[in-house]
Curated annotation (Swiss-Prot):
Single GO cellular component term: cytosol
Stored NCBIfam families: PRK00094.1-1, PRK00094.1-2, PRK00094.1-4
Domain of life: Bacteria
Residues where NADPH binds: 15-16, 36, 110, 143, 259, 283, 285
Disulfide bonds: none
Residues the record lists as binding sn-glycerol 3-phosphate: 110, 139, 141, 195, 248, 258-260
Family per record: Belongs to the NAD-dependent glycerol-3-phosphate dehydrogenase family.
A Pfam family reported for this protein in Swiss-Prot or TrEMBL: NAD_Gly3P_dh_N
Organism (species): Cronobacter sakazakii (strain ATCC BAA-894)
Role, per record: Catalyzes the reduction of the glycolytic intermediate dihydroxyacetone phosphate (DHAP) to sn-glycerol 3-phosphate (G3P), the key precursor for phospholipid synthesis.
PROSITE patterns xref list: NAD_G3PDH (PS00957)
Keywords, comma-separated and alphabetical: Cytoplasm, Lipid biosynthesis, Lipid metabolism, NAD, NADP, Nucleotide-binding, Oxidoreductase, Phospholipid biosynthesis, Phospholipid metabolism
Record-given protein name: Glycerol-3-phosphate dehydrogenase [NAD(P)+]
GO MF annotation terms: glycerol-3-phosphate dehydrogenase [NAD(P)+] activity; NAD binding
Length: 339
């Protein structure tokens, strides 16, 4: 392959990165998929599928595997980063000196920066500088369904209108993958972080056995927390009624493909945090996101009671049922209250 002609380089060969690479390649684009483990990339190349996570989806011929980072980054000006949020900044600093001069960076990572709670746009600007166009994609996307070509829709926000148009054209597929543009760069990022937290809470509720009424109440009040935090950060409230907000929230709170939901269910059934994480076997983004979202909310003065109680369970040893009863026992409020 003449790597100069690749439409996209995907950084991160986990389940979601692989699914996005497959989707792009299925659209007829040459795509390079890079992973940090050469042995893993060699296995993907030999199997021509991601047998660990997406065993029934063969790679299109236009999907190319690469273990050398410099070669992968030379392949395309468009770089899609799909790595866990706690290594996001580290990965950007790693790729910065190897990127092409005309590089543009989009990420599908959902979350905030570990320890600081900063938005990923701030991490990206610090790592990459002010000149590189940035974009984010987010929405209700389980990797298995996306890779299988089942109908999916997401939101896309970018700092550069041309980049947004180009990405929408690259990703959009009328048969299965609908991409909605959205100018709200902050809101599209924030929804993906907060929904991870609320999904843990919904899982806890179901694990305890509280039923559909309680789950729906958590989703609805979780959306209110998301919207309040977004408003404090300057996001457009309508964004949270779209794919990156309500769409992703409903998906991850109601389907057991969600690692965050399954993690919460185990906690609700009495498992401790460590054993629940070990049973999941993959990164549970909501675990770190809970701490980060809580810190961000405190910094901007937004009350998020659901997030607070989930934090108490994850980091302070509080029992999940006790946390739920604390929420139920809060003083009466107007539904439209800012608290």
């Amino acid at each position: 392959m003449n790597t100069i002609n690749a439409s996209m380089t995907v950084i991160g060969a986990g389940s979601y990165g692989t699914a996005l690479a497959i989707t792009l390649a299925r659209n007829g684009h040459h795509v390079v998929l890079w992973g940090h483990d050469p042995a893993h990339i060699a296995t993907l190349q030999a199997d021509r599928c991601n047998a660990a996570f997406l065993p029934d989806v063969p790679f299109p011929d236009t999907l190319h595997l690469e273990s050398d980072l410099a070669t992968a980054l030379a392949a395309s000006r468009n770089i899609l980063v799909v790595v866990p949020s706690h290594v996001f900044g580290q990965v950007l600093r790693q790729i910065k000196p190897l990127m092409r001069p005309d590089a543009r960076v989009v990420w599908a990572t959902k979350g905030l920066e570990a320890e600081t709670g900063r938005l990923l746009q701030d991490v990206a600007r610090e790592a990459l500088g002010d000149e590189i166009p940035l974009a984010v994609i987010s929405g209700p996307t389980f990797a298995k369904e996306l890779a299988a070509g089942l109908p999916t829709a997401i939101s896309l926000a970018a700092t550069d209108e041309t980049f947004a148009d180009d990405l929408q054209q690259l990703l959009h597929c009328g048969k299965s993958f609908r991409v909605y543009s959205n100018p709200d760069f902050i809101g599209v990022q924030l929804g993906g972080a907060v929904k991870n937290v609320i999904a843990i809470g919904a899982g806890m509720s179901d694990g305890i056995g509280f039923g559909a009424n309680a789950r729906t109440a958590l989703i609805t009040r979780g959306l209110a927390e998301m919207s309040r935090l977004g408003a404090a950060l300057g996001a457009d409230p309508t964004t949270f009624m779209g794919m990156a907000g309500l769409g992703d929230l409903v998906l991850t709170c109601t389907d057991n493909q969600s690692r965050n939901r399954r993690f919460g269910m185990m906690l609700g059934q009495g498992a401790d945090v460590q054993s629940a994480q070990e049973k999941i076997g993959q990164v549970v983004e909501g675990y770190r996101n809970t701490k980060e979202v809580r810190e961000l909310a405190a910094r901007v003065g937004v009350e998020m009671p659901i997030t607070e109680e989930i934090y108490q369970v994850l980091y302070c040893g509080k029992n999940a049922r006790e946390a739920a009863l604390t929420l139920l026992g809060r003083t009466r409020k107007d539904e439209r209250s800012s608290q």
